């Protein structure tokens, strides 16, 4: 094999030298950043992380450097917050200073600061407020949000009955239900689960969800300026993001032809009405680009996350038949087997509510929230974090806190019950993060999880294909997400 030519070798040395200089400069001029392991040129602290179990690596580093420490991803510093006290202090007590959105280049480069998730400043405040109010106001003379979710729960149960108590993988069916709810919210339409248009949309969302954890995406997020010129699967990811956006824009065109501002049918109608109201404001953030990206954000955040939580939840109930039996008993006693569950039943179902909370705590679907960033030079404890620095609130460190949740590695609904069997709230329940940047769809997700979960358990007994004690429930840690291991089960009608 030939040695590298002198020009190539010189270029390589130059790149490494510049990278080392960049890291050194940031460390010298970075205010008083929290302590952390010494980064290497180009790769930063990647070698200190087990990419197959990043949460374990972050907890290990916290033991060495404390609850606030600095890691370098590539050449860029990131402040990690470990534990409830520091996360609360940053996101609640100093929330306005930590309100920025940290980098996630693979999505950021496609959405370019539009939509809800990756926008900043006044645009973010405006679009978030509009989206929250629109979701809240569903039902003003129309079908309420709860009615839309209940309708989908009935359709989901009909599909599950078609399995005829035979072994099946629930992944696809459970993903269809929350995706259809988003379709109903955005453009007042739901699809049969075998509809070709719907299947194409599901394919785009599903592939991107799983590819977020791939080595290609991780490399892009570390070195976006280089990776954008290199062929690879990261380009397929961006194309699929564009596919979801184009799907929404087609629906927008249909709505523009039949829009009645006095009688909005859905989210798209409400947004189009705002565009019309502000058509003379050339700087208005109510435009088609923000509409398309807001819709994409709702699909991305509201489909796979909810379905994965449901899928993991069913697996845990198959693993723990004694818990499933208590849920069945409570549902039969409070609701019966024929009346559709509704949100007003939640207060009367403390054990079921505790099980749902424990599922979300135990699986820690998102070990870390999406990255934040400080919007100004920020004094935090004994440190000064420079403006624009990324911040990772490490949610797993809260959800698995040993003082708040004794034996946190054990699945135990008792974590959310008091001595009288009543539901027990805790500030440490943070699967949707904390503060003003918490998940905009939290209310919808909580509603979906409750109504889908109770409707399924009302109608079916969940049966394992092996002895429950032999079931593997260890999360598959893939980087950004904790996913359930693949499994099949039987649903036996009750």
UniProtKB/Swiss-Prot annotation:
Chain positions recorded as heme binding sites: 439
Residues with the Phosphoserine modification: 131
Pfam families: p450
Organism domain of life: Eukaryota
Family under the similarity heading: Belongs to the cytochrome P450 family.
GO cellular component, one term: endoplasmic reticulum membrane
Null mutant phenotype: Mutant mice have normal development and lack symptoms of disease or organ malformation. Become hypertensive in response to high sodium or high potassium diets.
Gene: Cyp2c23
Subcellular location: Endoplasmic reticulum membrane; Microsome membrane
Catalytic activity: (5Z,8Z,11Z,14Z)-eicosatetraenoate + reduced [NADPH--hemoprotein reductase] + O2 = (8R,9S)-epoxy-(5Z,11Z,14Z)-eicosatrienoate + oxidized [NADPH--hemoprotein reductase] + H2O + H(+); (5Z,8Z,11Z,14Z)-eicosatetraenoate + reduced [NADPH--hemoprotein reductase] + O2 = (11R,12S)-epoxy-(5Z,8Z,14Z)-eicosatrienoate + oxidized [NADPH--hemoprotein reductase] + H2O + H(+); (5Z,8Z,11Z,14Z)-eicosatetraenoate + reduced [NADPH--hemoprotein reductase] + O2 = 14,15-epoxy-(5Z,8Z,11Z)-eicosatrienoate + oxidized [NADPH--hemoprotein reductase] + H2O + H(+); (5Z,8Z,11Z,14Z,17Z)-eicosapentaenoate + reduced [NADPH--hemoprotein reductase] + O2 = 8,9-epoxy-(5Z,11Z,14Z,17Z)-eicosatetraenoate + oxidized [NADPH--hemoprotein reductase] + H2O + H(+)
Descriptive protein name: Cytochrome P450 2C44
Coarse class of the protein's main subcellular location: endoplasmic reticulum
Cofactor(s) this protein cannot do without: heme
Stimuli inducing this protein: Up-regulated by high sodium or high potassium diets. High sodium intake increases expression in thick ascending limb and distal convoluted tubule. An increase in dietary potassium intake induces expression in distal convoluted tubule and cortical collecting duct.
Signal sequence coordinates: 1-25
Enzyme class: oxidoreductase
InterPro entries: Cyt_P450 (IPR001128), Cyt_P450_CS (IPR017972), Cyt_P450_E_grp-I (IPR002401), Cyt_P450_E_grp-I_CYP2A-like (IPR008067), Cyt_P450_sf (IPR036396), Cytochrome_P450_fam2 (IPR050182)
């Amino acid at each position: 094999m030939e040695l590298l030519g002198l020009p190539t070798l010189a270029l390589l040395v130059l790149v490494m030298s510049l990278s080392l200089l960049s890291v050194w400069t940031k460390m010298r001029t970075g205010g008083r950043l929290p302590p952390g392991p010494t980064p290497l040129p180009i790769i930063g602290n990647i070698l200190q992380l087990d990419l197959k179990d990043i949460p374990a690596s972050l907890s290990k580093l916290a033991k060495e450097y404390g609850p606030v420490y600095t890691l370098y991803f590539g050449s860029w510093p990131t402040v990690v917050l470990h534990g409830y006290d520091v996360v609360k202090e940053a996101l609640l007590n100093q929330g306005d200073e930590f309100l920025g959105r940290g980098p996630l280049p693979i999505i950021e480069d496609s959405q370019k600061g539009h939509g809800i998730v990756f926008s900043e400043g006044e645009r973010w405040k405006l679009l978030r407020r509009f989206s929250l109010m629109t979701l809240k106001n569903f039902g003003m003379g129309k079908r309420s949000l709860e009615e839309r979710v209940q309708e989908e729960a009935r359709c989901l149960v009909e599909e599950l009955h078609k399995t005829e108590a035979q072994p099946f993988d629930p992944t696809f069916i459970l993903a269809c239900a929350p995706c259809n709810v988003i379709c109903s919210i955005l453009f007042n339409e739901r699809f049969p689960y075998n509809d070709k248009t719907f299947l194409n949309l599901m394919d785009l969302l599903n592939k991107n969800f799983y590819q977020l954890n791939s080595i290609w995406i991780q490399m892009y997020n570390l070195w976006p300026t280089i990776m954008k010129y290199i062929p690879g699967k990261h380009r397929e990811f961006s194309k699929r993001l564009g596919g979801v956006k184009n799907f929404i824009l087609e629906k927008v065109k249909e709505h523009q032809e039949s829009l009645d501002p006095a009688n909005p049918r859905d989210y798209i109608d409400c947004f189009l009405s705002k565009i019309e109201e502000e058509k003379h404001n050339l700087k208005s953030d109510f435009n088609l680009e923000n509409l398309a990206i807001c819709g994409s954000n709702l699909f991305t955040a509201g489909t796979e996350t909810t379905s994965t939580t449901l899928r993991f939840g069913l697996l845990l109930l198959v693993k723990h038949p004694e818990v499933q039996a208590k849920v069945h008993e409570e549902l039969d006693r409070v609701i019966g087997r024929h009346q559709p569950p509704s949100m007003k039943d939640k207060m009367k179902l403390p054990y079921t509510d505790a099980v749902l909370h424990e599922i979300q705590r135990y699986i820690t679907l998102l070990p870390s929230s999406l990255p934040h960033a400080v919007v100004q030079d920020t004094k935090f404890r004994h440190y000064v974090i420079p403006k624009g620095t990324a911040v990772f609130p490490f949610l797993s460190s809260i959800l698995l806190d040993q003082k708040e949740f004794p034996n946190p590695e054990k699945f135990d609904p008792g974590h959310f019950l008091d001595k009288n069997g009543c539901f027990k709230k805790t500030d440490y329940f943070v699967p949707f993060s904390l503060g003003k940047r918490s998940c905009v769809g939290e209310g919808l997700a909580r509603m979906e999880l409750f109504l889908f979960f109770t409707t399924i358990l009302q109608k079916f007994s969940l049966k394992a294909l092996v002895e429950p004690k032999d079931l593997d429930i260890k999360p598959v840690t893939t980087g950004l997400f904790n996913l359930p291991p693949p499994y099949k089960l039987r649903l036996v009608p009750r």
